[in-house]
């Protein structure tokens, strides 16, 4: 009996496409998805009993591996005395204090329930603070399913081949300007044309939602310069790369200070969580201190705060975790490139710490959305199915990142490379 198929087919009767997030349907790779039953460390198991080495990690959050003992214990302990109050708790203070005291450029922070909430709230705050309306986002970057961001977006929008999004009025995107990632001149031209109306720039400082694309430090410095010149705010979307490429996130890669930063994924320890923070003078514009209103019934939920606190504290106290992830990430990157060269495969590998994407393209480098779109989707599909059959859970999309955890070992990387060696292209 194929339990995966049975469960997924029944799911399609009750959930659109059988899923609660489109990429999980595996539509772009043409098969039914495995239905996951359990996970521990770097491994997951599906309903048919198949085990996989997991390089998806819930799309990034599980940097400590699945069911980390300290995170599980924190959740259990908190759930015995609290689930939700809709009121202030000591746990939300503990996590906020830890974040503000150990992260750069975060004087104050506001907890929310998702990355989408964090980014849309940060943009609202930027508009309220500057009294301007227009926001620059970059083609291929994904900042959640907020209407104003669903234009030339990455992630599932790109994976599913959706040119736009039905239900998003033209009015909702009229104040969204599209920049080209790593193109200084084009962004400068946007400011020359619209500068007095631009409230801010939102950017993934390491893009992960069109696959991993690194930001040129010179480009980032230009963004800071333009924001300062025109009185706009620079917003780093670190939903994916925060606590992942380094404890302090991608900010550590640039000699540039953002005005606002958004977080989610890792900081929730695997539970629904998000946050945005920044300079005190900006954050104090939020209600109840200022006129920018944002609220949430479940924001600062005690169980979520306990999972986040256990995760963030463990990462802060163990900097060697990042050394380990860098070591195995480098081994994976070098090994894949050596095999591809030997086989004559057109391949670009982009990696930052524990985020990595294999782009099947004949280009020499991938540094923007247009480069990403040159990739061979059919070859990626063959690669994906090959690796899945070899026991590896990797993203079912050319346009997503693979992730590494502290529970991945060099042996796991060796097995990945052995499997990739047998891929015929």
UniProtKB/Swiss-Prot annotation:
Chief place where the protein resides: cytoplasm
Pfam families: Aminotran_3 (PF00202)
Membrane-spanning intervals of the chain: none
N6-(pyridoxal phosphate)lysine: residues bearing it: 265
Molecular functions per Gene Ontology: glutamate-1-semialdehyde 2,1-aminomutase activity; pyridoxal phosphate binding; transaminase activity
Quaternary structure, from the entry: Homodimer.
Name used for this protein in its record: Glutamate-1-semialdehyde 2,1-aminomutase
Organism: Clostridium perfringens (strain 13 / Type A)
């Amino acid at each position: 009996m194929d339990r995966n198929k049975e469960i997924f087919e029944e799911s399609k009767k009750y959930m659109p496409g059988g899923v609660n997030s489109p990429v999980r349907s595996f539509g772009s790779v043409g098969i039914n998805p495995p239905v996951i039953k359990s996970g521990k460390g770097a491994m997951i198991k599906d309903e048919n009993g198949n085990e996989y080495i997991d390089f998806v990690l819930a799309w990034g959050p599980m940097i400590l591996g699945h069911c980390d003992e300290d995170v599980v214990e924190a959740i259990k302990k908190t759930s015995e005395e609290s689930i939700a109050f809709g009121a202030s708790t000591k746990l939300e203070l503990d996590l906020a204090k830890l974040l503000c005291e150990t992260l750069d450029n975060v004087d104050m922070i506001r907890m929310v329930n998702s990355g989408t909430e964090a980014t849309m709230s940060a943009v609202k705050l930027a508009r309220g603070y500057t009294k301007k309306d227009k926001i620059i986002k970059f083609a291929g970057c994904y900042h959640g399913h907020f209407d104003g961001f669903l234009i030339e977006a990455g992630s599932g929008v790109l994976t599913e081949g959706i040119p736009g999004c039905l239900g998003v009025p033209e009015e909702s995107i009229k104040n969204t300007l599209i920049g080209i990632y790593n193109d200084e001149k084009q962004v400068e031209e946007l400011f020359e044309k619209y500068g007095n109306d631009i409230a801010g720039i939102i950017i993934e400082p390491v893009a992960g939602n069109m696959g991993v694309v690194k930001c040129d430090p010179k480009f980032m410095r230009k963004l800071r310069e333009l924001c300062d010149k025109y009185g706009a705010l620079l917003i780093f979307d670190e939903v994916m790369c925060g606590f992942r490429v380094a404890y302090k996130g991608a900010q550590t890669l640039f000699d540039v200070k953002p005005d606002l930063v958004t977080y989610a994924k890792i900081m929730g320890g695997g539970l629904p969580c998000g946050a945005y923070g920044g300079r005190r003078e900006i954050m104090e514009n939020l209600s109840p201190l200022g006129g920018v209103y944002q609220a949430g019934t479940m924001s600062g939920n005690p169980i979520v705060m306990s999972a986040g606190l256990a995760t963030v504290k463990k990462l802060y106290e163990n900097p060697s975790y990042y050394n380990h992830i860098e070591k195995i990430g480098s081994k994976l990157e070098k090994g894949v490139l050596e095999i591809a060269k030997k086989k004559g495969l057109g391949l670009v590998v982009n990696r930052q710490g524990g985020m990595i994407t294999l782009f099947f393209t004949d280009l020499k480098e991938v540094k923007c959305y247009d480069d990403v779109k040159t990739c061979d989707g059919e070859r990626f599909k063959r690669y994906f199915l090959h690796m899945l059959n070899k026991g590896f859970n990797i993203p079912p999309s050319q346009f997503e990142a693979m992730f590494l955890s502290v529970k991945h070992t060099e042996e796991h990387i060796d097995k990945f490379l052995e499997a990739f060696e047998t891929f015929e292209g």
